[in-house]
Structures are given as C-alpha cells and as structure tokens.
Amino acid sequence: MPGENSFDIVSDFDQQELVNAVDQTLREVQTRYDLKDAGVTLTLSKTELIIEADSEMALRSVRDVLETKALRRKLSLKIFDYGKPTDASGGRVRQVVTLRRGIDSELAKKIAKMIRDRFPKVQPRIQGDALRVTGKSRDELQAVIAFLRERESEIPVPLQMTNYR
C-alpha cells in the first residue's frame, strides 16, 4: 500500500542485560556483610528467575539489589512478576519471579481500543504478541507513540515501538 506508514508495539527486554544484572546482583550479595551468610542463590532461565535465601528479609534485600541493578542496565521493573515467597527445603525461602515478555491478547485488545478511541485515522492490528499500527500520516503515528508514552503507567508491561516506517 503506497503512502502507508506503520510501527510495531512490542514488549521485550534484552536478555543479556538481564543476565548481567543478575550476575552483578550475585556479586554484590556475596560481598555485602548482611547478606554474605544468607545462602543466596539466583537461578535464571528464559522465562523465570528463582531467588532463594535463608530468610524473607534477605530475600527482600536481594530483590532490592536486583531491581537497582536492573534499572542501572536500563531494564524496566515491569518485566518482573513476583510470585509469593514460599518455603523451600531446610528452612529456606524461595521466590519465583516470572519474566514478562510479549503482549497477551487481552492487553493487546485494550491497547488497540485506546488507540482507536483517540486516533480514528490509524488502524491497530494484533499480530501474535505484538501490535502493528498503520496510518497514512507519520504525524498521526508520532502522536500515537507520544500518547502511549503518556499512558505507560496504566499498562502493566514495558512497551517498545519498533519498525517505524
């Protein structure tokens, strides 16, 4: 379609930056006096992070350190979905942190409706775990991007705008 401009709305994070943040967290935990003997372990997979410690207080401290390191590495805290701390073997405490990636269909519908209500000249389309917004005017698309940046606090996942053409 000649004259059509578009961009994609995705929710993703840099896996390597997360690996670096977890590594820095482990290093700081091993050198901090209050956490040195807390037996802290962090296990990272593609979809989740498991934090284990001797006490709930140590678990909270590790979580704070992790959030600080993630922010320094330009990772949004919205990617972390903290589960309830549960008891692990040996009197330890475990917390599973699910890593949010992609936009689920319910949220995609909500975002598409927000865009449609405010900007009738653009067409948002759901494509798997992303959203493509097309329109004739680049100015309209820029306005949609600015609108989404303003409303980012209402959206539970971090958004990135990619493939702007």
Swiss-Prot record:
Keyword check for Nucleotide-binding: yes
One of the Pfam families matching this protein, by short name: DUF520
SUPFAM superfamilies: YajQ-like
Function: Nucleotide-binding protein.
Keyword flag Nucleotide-binding: yes
Alphabetical list of CDD domains matching this protein: YajQ_like (cd11740)
GO cellular component, one term: cytosol
Name of this protein: Nucleotide-binding protein Cagg_1607
NCBIfam families on file: PRK05412.1
Keywords, sorted A to Z: Nucleotide-binding
Record GO terms (molecular function): nucleotide binding
